[in-house]
Amino acid sequence: MSSRREIRWGIARVYASQNNTLITITDITGAEIISRASGGMVVKADREKPSPYAAMLAANKAATEAFDKGISAIHIKVRAQGGYGSKTPGPGAQPAIRALARAGFIIGRIEDVTPIPHDSIRRPGGRRGRRV
């Protein structure tokens, strides 16, 4: 008789922009937020929010909170700004994924869910541009 612990799946959403990294861990349906952390929550200076180190600390904080609530396996969804913004994730995406993997979660799948337009998109600022 082997006493296997039941695997509870969750979804880790990593939003990595050029200015911050947000990590949200939800249940498998996505309806209930289990833990949430960002680069700005774990560092003191604003200029350190987008750093890989802040992303790693935020991922560790979210992971420990999710572990305490019973999540043992996660699917990871990585997202950049998308739309008229950057289509590539910011500097905190890779360290956040690595920290979630090292935290002891079973990793299901990692996918990029950045919103990409299938036609052109109109940038903000209007016809004559942003007047400074």
Curated annotation (Swiss-Prot):
Entry-linked PROSITE patterns: RIBOSOMAL_S11
One BP term from GO: translation
SUPFAM superfamilies documented for this protein: Translational machinery components
One term under GO cellular component: ribosome
Function summary: Located on the platform of the 30S subunit.
NCBIfam families found in the cross-reference section: arch_S11P, PRK09607.1
PANTHER family: 40S RIBOSOMAL PROTEIN S14/30S RIBOSOMAL PROTEIN S11 (PTHR11759)
Descriptive protein name: Small ribosomal subunit protein uS11
Organism: Sulfurisphaera tokodaii (strain DSM 16993 / JCM 10545 / NBRC 100140 / 7) (Sulfolobus tokodaii)
Upper classification of the organism: Archaea, Thermoproteota, Thermoprotei, Sulfolobales, Sulfolobaceae
Gene name of this polypeptide: rps11
